[in-house]
Design a protein with these regions (language model features):
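Flexible, glycine/threonine-enriched loop-and-boundary segments that flank and lead into catalytic domains
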Residues: 27-61, 140-145, 149, 157-165, ...
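Acidic, metal-ligating active-site segments
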Residues: 66-80, 238-240, 246-247
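Short, surface-exposed connector motifs at secondary-structure boundaries
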Residues: 138-146, 171-176
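Acidic, metal-coordinating catalytic cores used for nucleic-acid/nucleotide bond scission
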Residues: 148-157, 182-186
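Acidic two-metal-ion nuclease catalytic site recognized across multiple nuclease folds
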Residues: 248-273
Length: 273
């Protein structure tokens, strides 16, 4: 069990609780990078827009409050394996972050901008109009079923504008869904993302920006065993990973979402006679 706990974060948390009696709120590293790299498949690398055009997908938007990074993630169920996903995402930072001497990551940002992995908005704070335009363009290019957006203050105005523009889907339900950022909202999709990662079913194309963020993800566990993503230092960014969890949450709620065991999230039912 101890050996398995070293490579599997879910088993590590259980091992700490039930074998080492380490209860309460725990913080552990989410996933070893060599496990994340299981999703790097030659036939899915790199992930580009054109092969995904017109395909059904689900979105997650993690918005920056002022000058931080904003991430917009799309997950596409694979045609050849409906339990796997191709992921495509956009990240933005204000242009001033590339020259801000207090930004420890500015050299990485410059490289990612050159590589086309990171977009900039003019000025010192994030410009939501650029994000809105990009999302609406993606909704024209791809068949975005639903998208999740932070229901807290960062998402209220933009979320309403997107909801007005995108309206409802074929099922009559809103295409823009407000999502909480707490343990209860993240517990189930975190399990789903973990399972997909361990099975090598998140096809990420080896994207360097996303991999850098995955390296910084820790899981914060509440006393009830619910997990949500977090980071240890402010200079570490996990926005793209958070948006991935949000997008996967939308996918798992859809009829075409992944099949899961009845025991994974619901536990065991007891019958009395």
């Amino acid at each position: 069990e101890a050996r398995e706990a070293q490579t599997n974060p879910a088993k590590e948390n259980n091992f700490r609780r039930y074998r080492l009696n380490q209860w309460g709120q725990q913080v552990t590293r989410w996933m070893p990078l060599h496990v994340w790299d299981l999703g790097l498949h030659p036939e899915h690398s790199p992930i580009t827009e054109e092969p995904l055009r017109g395909r059904a997908c689900f979105g997650g938007l993690d918005l920056a409050a002022v000058s931080d990074m904003t991430a917009w993630m799309l997950v596409f169920p694979c045609d050849e394996d409906d339990q796997a996903i191709d992921v495509l995402f956009r990240c933005w930072v204000p242009e001033a972050q590339l020259t801000n001497p207090r930004n420890k990551n500015r050299h990485l940002y410059e490289q990612w901008v050159r590589d086309g992995l990171l977009r900039i908005t003019p000025g010192t704070t994030i410009d939501y109009s650029h994000i809105k335009a990009a999302i609406l363009a993606d909704c024209q290019m791809f068949d975005v079923q639903t998208l999740a957006i932070d229901r807290l203050f960062q998402g209220q105005q933009l979320g309403q504008e997107l909801a007005d523009e995108l309206g409802t889907g074929p099922d009559g339900q809103p295409r823009v869904v407000a999502m909480g950022m707490g343990y209860l909202s993240f517990a189930s999709p975190m399990k789903a993302v973990e399972k997909l990662t361990l099975e090598g079913r998140i096809h990420h194309g080896g994207n360097g920006l996303l991999r850098w963020q995955v390296e910084h993800v820790v899981t914060r566990i509440d006393p009830a065993g619910n997990a949500k993503p977090d980071k240890e230092r402010s200079s570490e960014k996990i926005d793209a990973f958070v948006s991935l969890v949000m997008a996967v949450d939308q996918w798992t709620r859809h009829p075409s979402g992944p099949v899961e065991s009845a025991y994974e999230n619901r536990g065991v039912a007891f019958l009395s006679y």
